[in-house]
Every structure is written in C-alpha cells, then in structure tokens.
Amino acid sequence: MSLTPDEKYELITRNLQEVLGAKMIREILNERDISLYWGSAPTGRPHCGYFVPMMKLADFLKAGVHVTVLLADVHAFLDNMKAPMELVQHRVRYYEIIVKSILKSLNIPIEKLRFVIGSSYQLKEDYTLDNFRLAASTTEHTARRAGAEVVKQVASPLLSSLIYPGMQALDEQYLGVDVQFGGVDQRKIFVMAEEVLPVLGYKKRGHLMNPMVPSLAGGKMSSSAAANAKIDILDDPKTVNKKIRSAFCEPGVVEENGCLAFLKYVSFPAMELRGETEFVIDRPEQFGGRMVFKTYEEVEKAYKDLTLSPQDLKLGLESSVNTLLAGVQEQLKQYPDLDSILKAAYPDPKDLKKAMKQKKQDKKNAKKAGTTNASIAAESGAAPATESQTAESFKKLNLDD
C-alpha cells in the first residue's frame, strides 16, 4: 500500500529534533519522492550510536526517499587530522562494511542505497573551483562558528577546520540531493549551507536533525568518547554488560540518560522493524519477576515513577543491545578479511608511531641521497637540473654586479 505525501512526511520526520525547510520538503513530496544524503567521516571506530541514524535511514527508505550515504574521507582528514591519510582509506572500507552490516541486520535493503566516497568527486576541478568561490564569499567568523560543535576544538586550530563546513555545504549540490540529514550538532553547518549555496547560484536545501543520544557516561556519544562510555560494534556480550552496568543512570531522571535514550531511538524502532511488540525485562522472581512494556512511553513512565529501577532498566538494555550486536556480527562473518581491514584502519598506536617515525626517516635518507629534487622534477615532467645548468643560471643573475 502506497503512502500519501502527508504519511511520508510524518515517517520522514518522526523522532527528529528539528526540521529546517519543512514547507519545501512537503512541496516536493506533493510532486515526487525526495532525495537525501547522510554523511559520516571515518574517524574513530563505529559504536552503537550509529544505530540511531540507521533507524532513520530505515524510515527514509520506507517513505520512498532516495538515500545517499557519504563516506567523507576528506572531511575525516580535515578534522584536525583525526584520520591520517595513511589510515583514512582503510577506515573508509571499514566504515562501509559496518554501515552495510548494521542495515542488513535490521532487514533494511541496501540495494536502495547509494554509497559515495567523498574523494571520488571532492578533488575534481569543478568542485575545487566552487570551494574557492565559497571561501571568497564566506567570512572566517562564519566558517569557525559553523564548525564549532562538529570539528575538534583545539587551542591552535588548523586552517582545515575552516574548510570543513563549506565542503559539507557543497556536498549537497554535488550529490544532487534535496535534503541533508545529520545530528542536531550539525545545525550551524546546515544554517551556513542555507546561506552560502544561494550566493553561489545553487538552491537552498532542507535539513533534518536527529537528537544527540547521550553516552553511557552522560553527554554526547561520539567515536572520540572514553572507551567505557560507548559500546563498540564488535564488543562481546560480557563487555557490553560490563559497560551498561557501569553507566550513569540516575533513578527517576530521564534527561541525559543514555540508557533510556538508546531504548527510545534504537531498541523500540528496531523492534518495529523485526515485527516485535514487547520489550521484556527478565528479572529474577525474587526481585519481582518479568516486566513487559508495549511502548517506550510505558518504560519512561515506569522509570519516572520509580517502579522501574536503574538496575532493571540496564538488565533490559543489556539484552536489547546484545541482540542487535549479534545480528550485526553475524553479517560481518561475510567478510573474511575483516580482521586485516580493522588492523590496517586502527593499528596499535605504538605500531603507528613506529611506522610514522620510519617514514620520516626514509624521507631524510632520500633527501641526503639527493633523490628528493629528482623525484619532484620527474613528477612535474621536468628533467633534474645538472650542475652545469645550475652554474649557468647563476651566471645570468650577474651576482657580481
């Protein structure tokens, strides 16, 4: 049964924190299905927070949205070198595998998705020229403010942190979409995009924003969070249970509660995808026995009323997370080279430091051997200068005068 434009809009926007351009999105839906992109910069190892945007991708696909997943490798490098160039390509591959495996585990047909690697178009002439045009029409203050909640903040920021937001705006044009989807932490970049694209002669896009799900320790969940504040996609049940049991979970308090937030934005939507209708907490009989909830609202009310304790909430969450991860890890068995990809993408810090040190030494050795200039000349198509040519050039300068 096909959905009406209003039904599609409701499905597209449910569980979102904010929508920019709602009127425009509705107008497009009255004529055709919308196109949208979600971008992810391959920096730290993917964690359970990635289930949150995946649930929305499921909603988008169900609503007939044409979805593009951008693996933003150039952005990963620009973000204060979170992903060195030596590692970024390996991380792109690892992220792609993880995203596809999460979606498959949720029975979301990935055939309807388009995967694009940022460097496949961001290094081309037309994109580069537009990037210069954007830079010439955007103030440093605007770019810095736009990336404040997304780009890593350091005492002495690199110039790359100012390039990052503008490229994210340009991606909307070069991916040919109507809408960009991301976390509410991206809001300032989205607003910048709405301002700068029309200046370049391109149309303004709509923007959909997910709430930021708190980590297990409270605060924003991210790949750079402390290891015990996030659950890795590859964590085993014992590790998952240990992390959840140590989570910050104040009795009766809903705000900044990472356990409740995960249930709301991941567990219950996942149950819907699997056709399940009950969230079950299997307490031992001596502690009250089994608890059954039909909706997230029932769970939240019980927690507020203190009829559901933090310990029992965590017990139910452990089961939910382990079920989700078991499905993903089963899909990952299709990739026999996963271990080697993971090691290449996230090598031991000691090994990485050793490799970088060796690379630096190799450059020094090459310079001493006089090969550096020859390599540069060869790459540019010019022949290396001979000693006699160099002497002749100095003569022409008339240095004695």
UniProtKB/Swiss-Prot annotation:
Any Gene Ontology CC annotation: cytosol
UniProt protein name: Tyrosine--tRNA ligase, cytoplasmic
Annotated organism of origin: Schizosaccharomyces pombe (strain 972 / ATCC 24843)
Subcellular location: Cytoplasm
CDD domains, sorted: TyrRS_core
Biased composition (Low complexity): 368-388
Comp. bias regions, Basic residues: 355-367
Function statement: Catalyzes the attachment of tyrosine to tRNA(Tyr) in a two-step reaction: tyrosine is first activated by ATP to form Tyr-AMP and then transferred to the acceptor end of tRNA(Tyr).
E.C. number: 6.1.1.1
Keywords: Aminoacyl-tRNA synthetase, ATP-binding, Cytoplasm, Ligase, Nucleotide-binding, Protein biosynthesis
GO BP: cytoplasmic translation; tyrosyl-tRNA aminoacylation
